Amino acid sequence: MLEKILQKYKKNINGIIQVGAHIGQQVESFLEIKNIDIHLFEPQKEPLEILKKYKSYPNIFIHEFGLGNTNKKLKLYISDKKKGVSSSILKPKLHTKYFPEVKFNDYEKIEVRKFSDLENINGNFLMLDVQGYELEVLKGFENKINNLDYIYSEISIKE
């Protein structure tokens, strides 16, 4: 689905901001859009180490913190599946009921910042995959949300 959206609107996309970049599964699709900056936000240690393979690309910027509606350290509940793919700042509730194979037995303290406080990060395409924390991320954009033309989010209707 994401690839179709990027293909359809790539002429209008002037930069990508991905919050919850994980290990960079979408980066190759982003790179098909020429002459844009790609900002990847990932605070979790294990996936971040894999994501760093893109550090050598001059148009890819890796930010080692999360985004939200505050500037502080928060607890990130780490899932035990696929390098923490379901990890979340929000304490799991129904997730473990609908996905009993996913366990949250660990956490990390991560840095979270408001996007509105960041400088020199431009893009009109926002991709969110933050396990229920989307509204807090959007609130942290404040007036900079007006610079976005596209918001793509992965969501679950179960929780």
Report the location of each language-model feature.
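Phosphate/nucleotide-binding beta-alpha loop and adjacent structural elements of enzyme active sites
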Residues: 1-159
